[in-house]
Amino acid sequence: MTEKMQQKLSDSKVARWSVLALVAFTMLTGYILTDVMSPLKPMLEEQLGWNSTEYGFFTSAYGWFNVFLFMLIIGGIILDKMGVRFTGLASCVLMIIGCGIKYWAISDAFSMEGELFGWKAQVMVAALGYALFGVGVETAGITVSKIIVRWFKGKEMALAMGLEMATARLGTAMALSITVPFATYFQSIAAPILLCLIMLCIGLITFLVFCVMDRKLDASAGADEEEAEEPFRLKDILVIVTSKGFWLIALLCVLFYSAVFPFLKYATDLMVNKYNVDPELAGNIPAILPFGTILLTPFFGNLYDRKGKGATIMMYGALMLIGVHLLFTLPILNEWWFATIVMIVLGIAFSLVPSAMWPSVPKIIPEKQLGTAYAMIFWVQNIGLSMVPLLIGWILDTYCKVDNGTGKIAYDYTLPMAVFTGFGILALFIALLLKHEDKRKGYGLELPNIKG
């Protein structure tokens, strides 16, 4: 009897890596819009009259619906019930609608004046669009995580997650580096957002191609992981919330990402105010961070796949994060080259923790509850991503305004950077607790992912 060499489509390297390329591109388009406003902060203040508190309020909108309306957790439940294809397509549509609202608010076509819910109408409408987009991109993120587990389990899962994160970081790098030149060339702050809208539509098309391949996986011979609609059970959430390892991962996630993503929202402004970098070039230094992760996240993911040491990798990443923000806090070497070196180190730290953190979740939580588990982690993360930018904006406006003699708004970033340093210290403490819990429970975080 002839033995079948490949029982499932996911056993084909070409097929599973093609799937990764398709869904990673979809996420890249989402992450371009996520950070496209960061380099525009000075232009928003000068041309549209925004202040740091309004900018922080707008940035905090990313997690409004996810956190306060529990949309992300609902999305995770839908993911586990309806499957990756339905949830992914719905997420792409939400991203496009949210981006469209945000573009309208920032464009010249927006004519609403006065206030809306106590904020400038333009700020509030842009924030609502960003909040809707946030539901889409975060739900897409957990969907793609489950897709990778589905196609790469027992194979190169951490490497695949690392490459997906690297592609997402490429989107961040593009947002930070090309946004201001693009806006300047077209003489419109809204032009980069329109570009993002077009990219998101292309991302929807690539996800549709993935859906065709995923259906073929279900139909392939011996496919024992066919997606089926499952009824939601309360005990699925109880399995997750009663796991100490899950909560340690979730806390590490919110602390680590709160020290990175909100920092990136203000990093361009930091380069202008502390390191005297030209505003048109200032976004290039923070862009080093995602470019570094593009190379290093897959490297560390591959290391985790083959050698293990996931908990240790997360500890080292948190330790480096503390050092980076401490150097940004101290009033030393206010030169662009020093900021560049420190940003490179931050890129290494930002590669270490996610490359081990996300592939560790399937070792703690059963696969059938992964969608809900990832959603709950992202929900906790979104609390930080919502509150921290608003906190930093308020600190800047309240305590950090300085007179630099030019007549333009300027800020002293010492206090905000001290806050980010504090997040890093707490992240290291949680990473130590996670390693201890792994030894006690035997999750296998220090073991390789590739079987055999």
Task: Locate each region found by the language model.
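Cytoplasmic helix-loop-helix junction between adjacent transmembrane helices
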Residues: V123, G129-T167
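Helix-loop-helix hairpin linking two adjacent transmembrane segments in secondary transporters
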Residues: E164-R215
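Helix-to-loop junctions at the C-terminal end of transmembrane segments
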Residues: L69-V84, L296-K309, L396
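Conserved MFS/SLC helix-loop-helix module at the cytosolic interface between two early adjacent transmembrane helices
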Residues: L69-M112, V123
